[in-house]
Swiss-Prot record:
Name the record gives this protein: Secretory component protein SHR3
GO cellular component, one term: endoplasmic reticulum
Pfam families associated with the record: SHR3_chaperone
Summary of subunit composition and partner proteins: Monomer.
Lumenal side: 29-59, 115-130
Recorded topology in the membrane: Multi-pass membrane protein
Keyword set includes Membrane: yes
Amino acid sequence: MFSYSDFCSIGTAMILSATTFLMGVFFSNMPYDYHLLFNPNSTQEHFDLALRHYQILHETPLPVIVTLCVVAGIGLVGGTIKVFKPNPELQMFEYCSLGLYVLAICVFLTNVKTGIDCSVSHNWGEVTENQGLAVIASSNIILLVMFAGVIILQIGLWYSNWDLQKRLKEFYAQEEREAANAGKKTEKVDNAKKNDNKSKGAQKRKNAKK
């Protein structure tokens, strides 16, 4: 039977696998987003290329979208497993990790997904097309930062649990050594008492013979 700690290990693997996969998906937009956000010499051509890129993403086949949703769901399941019975000393980090993951999904749905739809409809609301594309690019950067935060938290939690288990093993080993030493001392005292009693008994018998 699996213990809860075993399920937590599986949950950590699920979170890390899903998060790194999603980071790769959004990082693939960086060749277009970089020029919109960080290139001071960006031209309208860069915005046109980014627009075309997001228009192509809008035509993503349904099986690919379903796969992306399944991967995101795996991360959510892993996070739920870990917050079911969290370590009281580390539970805030577990909650923050799951919260960051959920918030990243919300940012995708409200900013990136909406922006991709707008790239096709050209209905950008109160902002210009270039500003809307910059918002999508900024949202992708925010997503990468959030997912990186999830990974850092999970690595920190794993290390904390590993260090705790290591310290517990050392503590129990020390307790066993102390108990063994105490047992040896007690045995020596008992043997000394027995020898002393034997000596006294022998002395009494000698005195009785006299």
